[in-house]
């Protein structure tokens, strides 16, 4: 073949392979870009539009199936709309499911009255939903959430604690800043360091700084160690009921979680072992009288626009769904 003809054919092939967009979605696309302040280069715009459209149509199909009773939760377009699921998992999840020093083991209370529902938000234990940004620091937000709750239980004062302090300063304990970490390592840092600064004094940047700027005079919390829970939902329920919010890790790597909006989250593909995201259980409850409608109230760190005002109801007592009881722990204060 004549080389020039070959190049012409190749270029025509590329042109014909360019994505064809659904013009009926133009207004929604432009609105989404404006809402989330997206500015793309010429070469990226088409690719991102194609990813966004694919996600939009997947969400619409899921919600049609929800209306037919096939799912127990809805999905919605959100800030992750132009990300493939692979990108989403790389950027947003940062729990490192690695071997580490264990804490004390939780001793389940034998005679405690365990209520059918608990919500520590109503008791003042929980700070507003935060946003980790595009930094794999979920572990830090889960850890501060549990420590904020335990400090409130001890002092009666709710103080927002510094995730950036943990991101910058806990590498000696095994954490890797925006590249991931463990809540237990964060609790160990607070004990080793003798304190953790307040959010106000050490604000969140959403990036690695390589410099620890901890100021002892701004410390707003301390801990004496941490306790690991047995890998059972009943143990998690007893801990949440009697102690307050508990740090947990889950498998959050699915598109169904990426675009979760409301209802009780259940995905049959969710793993109880492959954990990638640190979150905070702040309570539990049930809908109606059906025993299958029990849920955990889980605080996420993707901002209040995601999910149920920043929270997700996760299926409870469904064989440790998404591994919610696999790596649960809390700090002792």
Curated annotation (Swiss-Prot):
Membrane-topology descriptor: Peripheral membrane protein
Keyword set, alphabetical order: Cell membrane, Cytoplasmic vesicle, Disulfide bond, Glycoprotein, Hydrolase, Lysosome, Membrane, Metal-binding, Protease, Secreted, Signal, Thiol protease, Zinc, Zymogen
Residues engaged in binding Zn(2+) 2: 163, 199
GO cellular component: apical plasma membrane; chromaffin granule; extracellular space; lysosome
Record: residues binding Zn(2+) 5: 251, 254
Record EC number: 3.4.22.15
Assembly and interaction partners: Dimer of a heavy and a light chain linked by disulfide bonds. Interacts with Long isoform of CD74/Ii chain; the interaction stabilizes the conformation of mature CTSL.
Name of this chain's protein: Procathepsin L
Organism annotation: Canis lupus familiaris
UniProt lineage: Eukaryota, Metazoa, Chordata, Craniata, Vertebrata
């Amino acid at each position: 073949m004549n080389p020039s003809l070959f190049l012409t054919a190749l270029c025509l092939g590329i042109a014909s392979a360019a994505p064809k967009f659904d013009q009926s979605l133009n207004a929604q696309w432009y609105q989404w870009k404006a809402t989330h302040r997206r500015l793309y280069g010429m070469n990226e715009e088409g690719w991102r539009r194609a990813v966004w459209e694919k996600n939009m149509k997947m969400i619409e199909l899921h919600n049609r199936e929800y209306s037919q009773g096939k799912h127990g939760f809805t999905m919605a377009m959100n800030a992750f709309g132009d990300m493939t699921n692979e990108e989403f998992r790389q950027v947003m999840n940062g729990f490192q499911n690695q071997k580490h020093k264990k804490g004390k083991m939780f001793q389940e209370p034998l005679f405690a009255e365990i209520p059918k529902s608990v919500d520590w938000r109503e008791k003042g234990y929980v700070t507003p939903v935060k946003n980790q940004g595009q930094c794999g620091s979920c572990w830090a937000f889960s850890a501060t959430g549990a420590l904020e709750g335990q400090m409130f239980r001890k002092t009666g004062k709710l103080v927002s604690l510094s995730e950036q302090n943990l991101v910058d300063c806990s590498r000696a304990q095994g954490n890797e800043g925006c590249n991931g970490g463990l809540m237990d390592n964060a609790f160990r840092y607070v004990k080793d360091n003798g304190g953790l600064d307040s959010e106000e004094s050490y604000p969140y940047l959403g990036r690695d700084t390589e410099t620890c700027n901890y100021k002892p005079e701004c410390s707003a919390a301390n801990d004496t160690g941490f306790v690991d829970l047995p890998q059972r939902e009943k143990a998690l329920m007893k801990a949440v009921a009697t102690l307050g919010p508990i740090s947990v890790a889950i498998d959050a790597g699915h598109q169904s979680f990426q675009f979760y909006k409301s209802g009780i989250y259940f995905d049959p593909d969710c793993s109880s072992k492959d954990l990638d995201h640190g979150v905070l259980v702040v309570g539990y409850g049930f809908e109606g009288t059906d025993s299958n409608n029990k849920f955990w109230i889980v605080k996420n760190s993707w901002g209040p626009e995601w999910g149920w005002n920043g929270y997700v109801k996760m299926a409870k007592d469904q064989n440790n769904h998404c591994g919610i009881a696999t790596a649960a722990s809390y700090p002792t204060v």
